Amino acid sequence: MKLYEYQAKTVFSEHKIPTPKSILIQKEDTNPEVKSVGFPSVVKAQVLSGGRGKRGLIQLVKNENEALYQVKRLFEIEPSMKHLLIEEAVHIDKEIYVSITVDAPSGKAILIASESGGVEIETLAVEHPELIIKEPIDLRYGLLSHQARHIAYQMNLSVNQTKQMIQILMNIYEIFKKYDAELVEINPLFATKEDTLIAGDGKIMIDDNSVFRQPRFAQTETDYSSEAAYEASLEGIPFIQFDGDIGLMCAGAGLTTTVYDLIHYEGGTVANYLEFGGPNYKKAVKAMEICLKVPSKVILIVTFGTIARADVMAEGIVEAIKKLNPDRPIVTCIRGTNEAHAVELLKEAGLTPLFDTEEAVRTAVRLAKGEKRWVFLSIEKPKCVSKASRVVKEAFGPNIW
């Protein structure tokens, strides 16, 4: 679970990490107190997606009229947004990047820092990897003071700022541990002309498996971008909604991201990302119900069952179709344990399961584009839709492919 910036900065302040003077504006505020932090100030949209600066969601304002205009504008262009953060402007000398995240391969945490803050760390890692400093953290002992000093001394700060940096790093680790975080990030950490350090932005991502231990951040339906996203969260189903045409139901993160890339490679667009493999493989009915809440043109189901048996997933898909009567085409490609039984179940339900992921993707893209001339029953033997559609129509209507 990702926290909003204002939530992250509240946590920072509680752990003695300096943040700019600020005020939180609610959407329903009819007379927002935009003057309370002074001018110039920065109006910042509180959304969970990245790239706010590039999208015009962070604006510098110099007076009350500009501030009121930006408040109104940002709420209009982000209608689902509930909050805005207005912060005092900071006199910046340099920007630093710092974070602590999970390093799964080593079973440790890792402290990452760079003098070149204010940019995406992924871009920096590709273009200038030499500017990034990493320090592994053994979770048995936590972040040790000599490790924090080792990082701080390489940031080329003043003596006073270096002392502050050491303490900030130690405090970030305390947050990381206390809140079961996968990531705690400050980007940028401002080194100011007044010889101080201030967190310019903040991210905290809490491990989804530990959210129940963090009741202060419990989210309600209004915190989600859509009803589908909220229901997926309640079910523990990984879900992201986009603006494309093809709804994805896939087993596992790796397969889902691969299919996502294949769809774009074939010229299609994705309406949603949804995983129903692993512990969720028996939730096919709920997964399809969530997918049907998304305005897509086609649902593409791709699975590879190992521990999650293919026939059990197929049973769930068939049950979902019977119960929900989908109003759009469905393309299936199920492989893995008990695959033969899964194929028979899908055929009995009027579906035409495919056996190749790339072919399934191409079929879904064609259907999304309105090319209904062909549906591929196998890789080798494409047949005209009209020949297969009679059986499908009798069972579930004309839109199951």
Curated annotation (Swiss-Prot):
Single biological process term from Gene Ontology: succinyl-CoA metabolic process
Pfam hit, one: ATP-grasp_2
UniProt-recorded name of the protein: ADP-forming sulfoacetate-CoA ligase subunit SqwK
Cofactor: Mg(2+)
Keywords of this entry: ATP-binding, Carbohydrate metabolism, Ligase, Magnesium, Metal-binding, Nucleotide-binding
Domain ATP-grasp: 9-217
InterPro entries named among the record's database cross-references: ATP-grasp, ATP-grasp_succ-CoA_synth-type, ATP_grasp_subdomain_1, Succ-CoA_synthase_bsu_CS, SUCC_ACL_C, Succ_CoA_ligase-like_bsu, Succinyl-CoA_synth-like
Gene3D superfamilies recorded: ATP-grasp fold, A domain, ATP-grasp fold, B domain, Succinyl-CoA synthetase domains
Species of origin: Acholeplasma sp
Lineage: Bacteria, Bacillati, Mycoplasmatota, Mollicutes, Acholeplasmatales
